[in-house]
């Protein structure tokens, strides 16, 4: 995405809810263009960020999961890695993954009444590993 690109809908975050919003948008408004801004280098939100032993949902996945892609795992209270896998599979299956702009954090949004247009400012992060001499 460049600074001149325009989309009809900008979704902030590629976690469970952001992926859901993108799938619903693509299914119900197929003529609308969209992008997802994800501040991190991977989708999944909480389920990618936190990796401590024993992390799991506190809600059953039959309720928390997507209506358009029901949770089929018999483990209703799912562990973090299973939820992350579910999110990634869903994003790929529905073509949402191609719309995610990683390492891009929305920092400002300004509404123009005259233009009937939001202008969103985002910063993009590049991760570098630089060797040094001892």
Language model segments and positions:
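Short, compositionally biased segments
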Residues: 122-125
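Helical element adjacent to the flavin cofactor pocket in flavoenzyme catalytic cores
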Residues: 84-100
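Glycine-rich active-site loop/strand segments that organize a redox cofactor
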Residues: 45-86
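N-terminal Rossmann-like FAD-binding beta1-loop-alpha1 element of flavoenzymes
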Residues: 9-35
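Conserved acidic E/D residue at the C-terminus of a beta-strand in Rossmann-like folds
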Residues: 36-41
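A short, basic/flexible loop-to-alpha-helix module at the beginning of a structural domain
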Residues: 1-6
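A conserved short coil-to-beta-strand element within the FAD-binding core of flavoproteins
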Residues: 102-116
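Single conserved hydrophobic/aromatic residue that forms the stacking wall/gate
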Residues: 127-134
């Amino acid at each position: 995405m460049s600074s001149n690109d325009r989309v009809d809908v900008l979704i902030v975050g590629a976690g469970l809810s952001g992926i859901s919003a993108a799938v619903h948008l693509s299914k119900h408004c197929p003529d609308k263009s969209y992008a997802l801004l994800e501040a991190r280098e991977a989708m999944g939100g909480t389920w990618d960020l936190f990796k401590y032993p024993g992390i799991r949902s506190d809600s059953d996945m039959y309720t928390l999961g997507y209506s358009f892609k029901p949770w089929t795992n018999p483990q209703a209270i799912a562990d973090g890695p299973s939820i992350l896998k579910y999110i990634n599979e869903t994003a790929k299956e529905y073509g949402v993954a191609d719309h995610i702009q990683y390492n891009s954090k929305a920092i400002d949004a300004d509404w123009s009444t005259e233009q009937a247009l939001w202008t969103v400012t985002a910063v993009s992060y590049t991760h570098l590993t630089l060797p040094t001499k001892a």
